[in-house]
Amino acid sequence: MKKQLQIFFDFLRFCIGSADEIPSSLKEADWKELYAIAKKQCLMGILFDGIKKLPAEHVEMEKELLLRWMAESQMLEKANVRLNDAAIQVSEWFRKKGFRTCILKGQGNALMYPNPYSRTPGDIDIWVEGGDKRVISFVYSISPHEKACYHHIEFPSYKGVEVEVHYRPSFLLCFWHNRKLQKYYERVKEEQFSYRMMLGKQGEIAIPTVEFNLIFQLTHIYAHLMNEGIGLRQLVDYYYVLISDDLSLVRDRVQKELKELGLWKFAGGIMYIMQEVFGMPASRLIVPPNEKYGKFVLNEVLEAGNFGRHDARNRFGRSKLGHNLQRVYRDMRLVKYFPTETLCEPLFRIWHYFWRKSK
């Protein structure tokens, strides 16, 4: 498995364009293993785009597997078209109700991919201007039984697509750092609600700027590490954020914010992964790579898969009690590397319980 994982990484670099040459290790590829890793990490479309660039003699896989991969890639394309339409329509619906919006992650991220239709889509995360009280009150007026948490509220699905309405793009568990993060979002929100892009030929939406995404998506990855687990898909998203624009004008500002938010070492770990796994040149990194943190985070990524769904270490079951026990077990792993965020987690959970009761 370790050998096939290295072949997977070699091929992934070719697929995302950081390596131009077809990796020689591909001659020893077990395509069933590569397929399984791609499926676990939600990178089916990315790898199939790479397969399409290969000469026939390099694709020594069974026809049945190739056809299955092709079919899944075509399904991804259709799903992205559907998600694009949902993002446009939901944004327009809120606009007519008097709310400015910005699509977070998802279809906005897909625009940075060479092939936007190869990204595995999820749901619609839409940042709605107005603050938690106003937005929650509005959603309750539409659908009274939706569940609200600190940063978003559930919303009726649109044509089968799940929608999460955010009044805060993301948050940190440490109260001190979170306060600074929310002030940052308040400071830069105007540009995010105004930065509009076309989604293919289907229509226009507001998406975040690159500078915003460098901070927001890092906090999103961090939150998933603390809560459920992260997969390579989130890191591929961040790779494309890093190469999507000239960072020389924003690097100093981003570094200042990362230090303020207590994310410097975590960012260094992600930069290590960007360099070692994705083959990113040093000129594109936003902070110096941190090998110690990078190896720890990479191990978490490979163990957990997308959203932690494949983590064999989840030994306590899916019940509420099992979830809480798993949380304690995860905190024990994380506290050595991220003590502030980990130790604040129980306090935040208690505070959040009363916050939800008040809504």
Labelled PLM ranges:
Residues 1-122, 127-359:
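Conserved NTP-donor binding/palm subdomain of two-metal-ion nucleotidyltransferases/polymerases, i.e.
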